[in-house]
């Protein structure tokens, strides 16, 4: 059985309902929210949605959600996520981020700590001393809103 992920399709203001309806027509149980719609599906479903959604800007995979009020907790909770399920051993990890209404407000520190945790997890998962990062670029977007 293929793993199911929580997915999202972003949309311009006013198109959230259109995106949710497009997803429903594709067979997903979609729920609209401010800025898009969410649904559950496999990686193949995410690819299919990315190809066939007309009103969406992009399709996102929500990989982890947790409370983080310290940089240590941000590191440890990112490190336990199974990044090796999605990233190959030579992935170039590119982390962007945003912080709002949270105790952790330094975006550059959040990005740096998240990347370090991902790299540490990948090194352990693939039995490497260092991560070569000479493969395809994988964009990881870390958002912290109200400490989550």
Where are these regions (language model features)?
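Non-catalytic nucleic-acid substrate-recognition regions in nucleic-acid-modifying enzymes
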Residues: 2-137
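Core structural elements
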Residues: 140-148
